[in-house]
Each structure stands twice: as C-alpha cells, then as structure tokens.
Amino acid sequence: MEKNINIDDFLKEGFDDCHPMFRNAPSTVEFNKLRKRLLRNMRQAIDDFSMLSSGEKWLVALSGGKDSYGLLALLLDLKWRGLLPVEILACNLDQGQPGFPKHILPDFLKSYKIPHRIEYQDTYSIVTGKLAQTQTYCSLCSRLRRGHLYRIAREEGCSALVLGHHRDDVLETFFMNLFHGGRLAAMPGKLINDEGDLFVLRPLVYAAEEDMEKFSQAMQFPIIPCNLCGSQDGLQRNAMKVMLNDIEKRMPGRKDTMIRALTNVRPSHLLDKKLFSF
C-alpha cells in the first residue's frame, strides 16, 4: 500500500464517486470527519502490521453487528478508491440462534452487489447441549464460529480472515487477562492461525468503539442484536468496559495512551523469568 496517499485528499473528491454503500450517507462536515478518522485508523493499522499483499483474497466476517458492518464498509471504501488491492468476500455464519433474521444480511449484501457467502451451521445446539443455561455461551460460541470461518476461508481460497474488533475490544481483553488470567495479552492486529495457513487481521484495532457506534448510526445499517440466544457477555468484560469508560471520562485520551503502550512493549522490563538467560 502506498503510504504517501492522503485520506483527506481522496475524500475531497466528494461523495459522487464512492462505493454504492455510501451514496445515501450524510454529507455533513461531522460525518466527513468521522469517516476520515476511521479510514486513517484503518490505514494506520494495515500499514503498522503489514497486512496487505496485492492480489490477496480476504474473508470478511459479517455478524450483523455495528462493528462488522463498519469494517466491511470502510474496507470497501478503500478498495473503491484503489487503495486496497485485494478481493473481498463477505461471510456470515448463521449459527442457528432462535429468532435470527435470515433475510437481513443476504438482502443487504445483494442490494450493494457485494460478493458474499452465507452458511448455516447449528452451533447453537452444540453450545446449549454442553453448557448450563446459567453459563455464558459467548466463549464456546466464538470458538466454534472461528473454526468454521477458517474452513470457509480455505474453501474460498482466502489468505486471511478479517475481524471487526476495535480499540476498546483490545483494551478490555488486555485487562481481563491482567486481572483474571494473570498474564499480559490482548488482541493482536495480525496473527497466524495454529495451522499456519491463514492470517487473522484486525484493521480496526485503532478505531474507537464510540466512533464505530456513530458511524453505524449514520450509515443506518440493519443491525442484528448479538443476544438472540439469551446469553449475555460475561460480567468480567462488562466490568472492564465500565472501568475503561470511567478512566476515559476522568482523564480523556487515556484509551489512546493505553493502545500506544501496547505497541511499545519492553519485555526486558517485565518479570517473565523465561526472558532472562543471563
């Protein structure tokens, strides 16, 4: 990717020449600023983690939530402008959750002529068969979904699975691991799966959840709720979200500082004895 292309410059062209998804987007100064900020965040992550190789094919996971819609829209925005020379295939895995509106995502993708694959796999029955109703389904559900997405990526000849985790997801995961797992770990912008044949990419790791929420509302995406199964995300993650939002409220800018810290790690100044052979 050319690093000397300025997001501000190509957005000065206006909205007449843009991906069809943006044809009815707001033309306000506020939305322009939001869109440019998110695109800068995305390009920075793509550059920082060397995500891009020309001619690749990416499988973009689409759950129907605000973040996955935003991820797809911003990737298509860059691709439309010639700044993302990869083939994009959107993919939704219908996991058999009761009440899941099967028509929403296919209708949305077809309306914009976005290449896609919709697959049904009843992982919901597997999860409910293994866990009690009082337990949180999210972790097992996520692992089963990831396995199917890896398989689909291979079947479709994709080099990478692209996920919509943003800055706040990264920080919440870091503090969950710190407080409850006793380890320093978060969500990387780029990793290789255990089999070594697929990359997992997170181009939104620098994007704020607040910005993604505003973007989703402005674009009027047909959001599908994530709690159709009746399970709520764990109390631990919710507690981390509340803590981080409180810190940000009292000391604005701390979330960005924390993300910078995760990009500036000094292992020799930590206490992992495996790092010391002298």
Curated annotation (Swiss-Prot):
Entry EC number(s): 2.8.1.-
Recorded catalytic activity of this chain's protein: cytidine(32) in tRNA + S-sulfanyl-L-cysteinyl-[cysteine desulfurase] + AH2 + ATP = 2-thiocytidine(32) in tRNA + L-cysteinyl-[cysteine desulfurase] + A + AMP + diphosphate + H(+)
Keywords: 4Fe-4S, ATP-binding, Cytoplasm, Iron, Iron-sulfur, Magnesium, Metal-binding, Nucleotide-binding, RNA-binding, Transferase, tRNA processing, tRNA-binding
Co-factor binding comment: Binds 1 [4Fe-4S] cluster per subunit. The cluster is chelated by three Cys residues, the fourth Fe has a free coordination site that may bind a sulfur atom transferred from the persulfide of IscS.
Residue intervals passing through the bilayer: none
Pathway the protein contributes to: tRNA modification
Residue numbers binding [4Fe-4S] cluster: C138, C141, C229
Motif window: PP-loop motif: 63-68
Cofactor(s) the record lists: Mg(2+); [4Fe-4S] cluster
SUPFAM superfamilies: Adenine nucleotide alpha hydrolases-like
Note: The thiolation reaction likely consists of two steps: a first activation step by ATP to form an adenylated intermediate of the target base of tRNA, and a second nucleophilic substitution step of the sulfur (S) atom supplied by the hydrosulfide attached to the Fe-S cluster.
Self-association state and partner proteins as the record states: Homodimer.
Role this protein plays: Catalyzes the ATP-dependent 2-thiolation of cytidine in position 32 of tRNA, to form 2-thiocytidine (s(2)C32). The sulfur atoms are provided by the cysteine/cysteine desulfurase (IscS) system.
The name this protein goes by in its record: tRNA-cytidine(32) 2-sulfurtransferase
Gene encoding the protein: ttcA
